[in-house]
Amino acid sequence: MTQQLQSIIDAAWEDRANLSSAAAPKEVLDAVEHVISDLNAGRLRVATRESVGQWTTHQWIKKAVLLSFRLTDNQVMKAGDLGFYDKVPTKFAHLDEEAMKASGVRVVPPAVARRGSYLAKGVILMPSYVNIGAYVDEGTMVDTWATVGSCAQIGKHVHLSGGVGIGGVLEPMQAGPTIIEDNCFIGARSEVVEGVIVEENSVISMGVYLGQSTPIYDRATDTVSYGRIPSGSVVISGSLPKNEGKYSLYAAIIVKRVDAQTRAKTSLNDLLRD
């Protein structure tokens, strides 16, 4: 079934200029809806983990998400007294209390998750935003004003602190999703974008900005890398000298590896997860 879906989506993508909500084969409409429904339920995900730091991105699923915008008309949506006009309904709009309880997710007003995102059991959404295609795994907290971008992959027992931005892939188009692996702590107002991978058990300090062009300096090895934070790293914002010290450019600095002291400062509070 998955191979058949992929073939339909890939063919529709090549013909996307000729598609619209009023001019698309039923086979394509059904395939796109099938993918969005499976993303919403966690049966499909845009990227799957092979090992620590190694992920496979399923481009055809990302194409299906993009096609869904082409094939869906805007419609009026209501949430209490609020009105919206959009193509993607909210994830919980039609769920009753029993269905919400069964999901195991806690949603604090006015948090929003779009249909096509997946939230595993034990996830807590403070007033935050989770976009279509995102996958948020068990026990993760998305704190106040944090945003999880389209197709981003968030691991188990992650804490996304207040105002954190996890970049999406839809605009501007990115090859791979931004990924935060298990047991990571992302400090307040930090931004991780452009398909950067933060490997498991890492701690990103407050106000760190990570994109594909951000130099990542490892103090222990005196090396610079890009696009990936190694497992168990503690990262702060800093700068590196350029042009023989005439000026400095922003950099993320790996100051040490996670130790017991770091864990004590960033441990999750089980009282908040009852």
From Swiss-Prot:
Pathway: Amino-acid biosynthesis; L-lysine biosynthesis via DAP pathway; LL-2,6-diaminopimelate from (S)-tetrahydrodipicolinate (succinylase route): step 1/3. Its EC number is 2.3.1.117. Belongs to the transferase hexapeptide repeat family. It is found in: Cytoplasm. PROSITE patterns: HEXAPEP_TRANSFERASES. Keywords: Acyltransferase, Amino-acid biosynthesis, Cytoplasm, Diaminopimelate biosynthesis, Lysine biosynthesis, Repeat, Transferase. Its main location: cytoplasm. Substrate binds at residues 106, 143. This is 2,3,4,5-tetrahydropyridine-2,6-dicarboxylate N-succinyltransferase. The keyword Acyltransferase applies. InterPro entries: DapD_Trfase_Hexpep_rpt_fam (IPR005664), Hexapep (IPR001451), Hexapep_transf_CS (IPR018357), THP_succinylTrfase_dom1 (IPR023180), THP_succinylTrfase_N_sf (IPR037133), Trimer_LpxA-like_sf (IPR011004). GO terms for biological process: diaminopimelate biosynthetic process; lysine biosynthetic process via diaminopimelate. It comes from Albidiferax ferrireducens (strain ATCC BAA-621 / DSM 15236 / T118). Homotrimer. It catalyses: (S)-2,3,4,5-tetrahydrodipicolinate + succinyl-CoA + H2O = (S)-2-succinylamino-6-oxoheptanedioate + CoA. The keyword Amino-acid biosynthesis applies. GO terms for cellular component: cytoplasm. GO terms for molecular function: 2,3,4,5-tetrahydropyridine-2,6-dicarboxylate N-succinyltransferase activity; nucleotidyltransferase activity.
